[in-house]
Amino acid sequence: MTIAEIRKHAATRMDQSIAAFRNNLQKIRTGRANPALLDAVQVDYYGALVPLSQVANVALIDARTISVQPWEKGMGAKIEKAIRDSDLGLNPAAMGDLIRVPMPPMSQERRKEMTKLARNEGESAKIAVRNLRRDANESIKKLVKDKLASEDEQKRAETEVQKFTDKHIAEIDALVAAKEQEIMAL
């Protein structure tokens, strides 16, 4: 592996870490309804647990209500039970074939818990980015040790990897701040 390949690999992996972090942030509940909130709900489908999105259509009705439309008529009760049993604190209501999931207003205490969760996710993402930096720097040092690169190239490459790291950590901080603001907004 050359230094250029190591840098490219590190940048790609850091981008993937940011994408995974964004995905995790979407699952954190805010005051508004978000269909991604129900992604983690598992439904019993003929003896197997499957994600809700594989047995129903999940959409927004308005800013505070999610609709769940089962693809099979008999699945309504199971979907309703799965949503109620999830640790999201939601209370679905069946209206014929359609299940409405109103988002209850969050208490101040719950909002603080959610911001803490967002910060913890941010810290985990930063740790992942820093670990990728460490791995890249170790690979670069190995090239120098094996005499496949000079020490000047090592310094340049490490500086570039550090710039990638700083950029990605700043992006994580910005995403966490935006999520905190979204959670605390009434």
Swiss-Prot record:
Residues in the signal sequence = none
One Pfam family from the record: RRF
Which CDD domains does the record cross-reference, listed alphabetically? RRF (cd00520)
Q: Which SUPFAM superfamilies does the record associate with it? A: Ribosome recycling factor, RRF
Q: Which UniProt keywords apply?
A: Cytoplasm, Protein biosynthesis
- GO biological-process terms attached to the record: cytoplasmic translational termination
Q: Where in the cell is it found?
A: Cytoplasm
Report the domain of life of the source organism.
Bacteria
| Any GO CC annotation of this UniProt entry | cytosol
Report the principal subcellular site. cytoplasm
Q: Entry's InterPro entries?
A: Ribosome_recyc_fac, Ribosome_recyc_fac_dom, RRF_sf
Family, similarity comment: Belongs to the RRF family.
What this protein is reported to do is described as: Responsible for the release of ribosomes from messenger RNA at the termination of protein biosynthesis. May increase the efficiency of translation by recycling ribosomes from one round of translation to another.
State the protein's name.
Ribosome-recycling factor
- Name the species this protein comes from: Verminephrobacter eiseniae (strain EF01-2)
